[in-house]
UniProtKB/Swiss-Prot annotation:
InterPro entries: A/AMP_deam_AS, A_deaminase, A_deaminase_dom, Ado/ade_deaminase, Metal_Hydrolase. GO terms for molecular function: 2'-deoxyadenosine deaminase activity; adenosine deaminase activity; zinc ion binding. PANTHER family: ADENOSINE DEAMINASE (PTHR11409:SF43). It is an enzyme of class 3 (hydrolase). It comes from the Bacteria. This is Adenosine deaminase. Catalyzes the hydrolytic deamination of adenosine and 2-deoxyadenosine. It comes from Salmonella paratyphi C (strain RKS4594). GO terms for biological process: adenosine catabolic process; hypoxanthine salvage; inosine biosynthetic process; nucleotide metabolic process; purine ribonucleoside monophosphate biosynthetic process. Pfam families: A_deaminase. PROSITE patterns: A_DEAMINASE (PS00485).
Amino acid sequence: MIDITLPLTDIHRHLDGNIRAQTILDLGRQFNIALPAKTLEALIPHVQVTSTEPDLVSFLTKLDWGVKVLASLDACRRVAFENIEDAARNGLHYVELRFSPGYMAMAHQLPIAGVVEAVIDGVRDGCNTFGVEARLIGIMSRTFGEAACLQELDALLAHREKITALDLAGDELGFPGSLFLSHFNRARDAGWHITVHAGEAAGPESIWQAIRELGAERIGHGVKAVEDRALMDFLAQQRIGIESCLTSNIQTSTVASLADHPLKTFLEHGVLASLNTDDPAVQGVDIIHEYHVAAPAAGLSREQIRQAQINGLEIAFLSDGEKRALREKVAAA
C-alpha cells in the first residue's frame, strides 16, 4: 500500500518511545540497573504493549523502562542514532523525531541541556550514516508540571537552531494547554513550528485551545475532532494537519477498534491527516505495518492511503523547497 514513487514520512514518532528492547537490556547490564527480566524474550512483555492498555497513562508506563537505563549522555546519543537506523530500515525518507529531554534525564539526573545536545549529535550522526532526512521536535512533558516544562523549554532553546518545533505531551486531562501559554509564546518567538497532542484523552475543546491559544499548526492524534463539525471544517479550511497513529490509538484505548478510527473520516472531510507510528518499539509496530495492515483495517481505500502518504510530506515542518527536493530525490531513485 506504500507508493514507492512518493516520499515515505513519519512525522509523529517519539524518539524516547522507540528504544529497542535489546538496547534496554544492553544498557541495563552496562550500568548495573535492575531490570524486570534478564533475557530479551522475558523483557519484551515489560517494555512492549502486548494487549490493549486501559488508558493512555497505563500505556505511557511501558515507556518508562526505556528511559530508566539512560544513565549517561552517551546512552542518549546511542538511542538517538538507533532511531535513525530504525527509520532507514523501515524505508523512511523523512522523519520528525520528538523527544522530552526532561523525561530522558529524570531517572539519573542527567543535565537536561546535555540530553538535548546528545540527541542532536546522535541524530546527526545517524542521518550522515544512513541517508535519512530528519528534524527534531522538542516535547514538554505536561505531566510533570509547568516548572519542569520550563526547564525543558530552556534546555531546548539553548539549541534552538537544531530544533524545528515544540510539542506538549502527557496527561492531557490533568494538565490542560492553558497552563502553558507563556511557554508557547517563547517557542513561537524563537521561530519554531508548533504541534500539540490534543483531542486524544480530552475532547474537541482541547484541540480548539491548542490552535487558538498555543498556536498549533498540527495536532497529534486529534481523534475527538470528529465530535465537532465546526472544528472539522476549520481543520480542513485552515490546512491544520492531523498526525494520526492508528495502532497507538487502539492500544491506549483512545479508540475502540481500527474500524472505529476517524482517519477515514478526516480524509473524506478534506483534513490533511497523515499516517504515523507514535512509539514503535513500545507498540511492536513499524510504519510498514501501519500502511499495510492498520490502514486497510481502518477502512481506508488504496487511494486514501496514498493521500495520507502525500499529506505526510505536505504537513511536514519543511520549506516548500525542501519538500520539492525530497519529492525529486525519491522520484529519481
